[in-house]
Amino acid sequence: INEYSASNCDNDGSDCGDYEDWIELFNNSQEPVDLQGYFLSDKIDNLLKWQFPNSLILQPQDHVIIYASGLNPDLEISSNETSFKLSQTKNNEYIILVSPDFTTIDYVQLSRHKLNHSIGRTFDGASDWSVFSESSPEGSNTGSSISYKATPYFNYDAGFYENSIELNINCDDVNVDIYYTLDGSIPNTGSNFYGTIDQNGNIQLSEPGLVLDNTVVVRAIAISQDNEYLNSFVETNTYFLNQEHTLPVISLAGSQVDNLLYGNQIRPI
């Protein structure tokens, strides 16, 4: 197992015509390998979940992409379409490669990654894993990053508050700049600057705290100062100030929410 993506909205090479999750296998030996009879699974308690039905020769130092499309196994059998999908929202999600004699060849637990990013070995066949902001399905792994910076967090949970609150943003990481927005947009270096955390973990604030008087969506990101790391995931909280309600409330924040509301597409926001 050399690389995978469970957030693919860019590479469409599957038979079902959708942007499917994908798994890249790499033959690090000097001999060709026929994958017929091998198994792939996403669950450690069901190692034989999907089996390669046909002959598929993987040449030495070559790659092959398997799409985790979740196709109904009763439909036409495909050599590169598994019966399961990958999910970043489950804690027990793996990719497991098993030989025809039921020996586990390789496995990796899924790590969370951003849209169109991938997780892969730092270079083809390496023992360590990295993040790739530019995935390379069926290509050599290059341009890796160690990981994402830690996601910022707030001192108040999202929810309803009767009075104004003073919001603080922190991050359990070093060498990051924290930016935030109050309009629901994804923060970047052009957004509101909150502060810097230096290499010793000391935070230098541009302002003492955010005083929230009205209902607002706050989103924050940690921008990496290190080339070896990628920017963090975005943390989003909605604060309802002095708002009465009698029904359950759901708050959505994203730049493509309209597409979801009107059924144009299924896509991360």
Protein language model annotation of sequence segments:
Residues 1-129:
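Activation on beta-sandwich/Ig-like modules and their edge loops
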Residues 4, 57-60, 66, 113-269:
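Short, compositionally stereotyped local motifs that mark structural "simplifiers"
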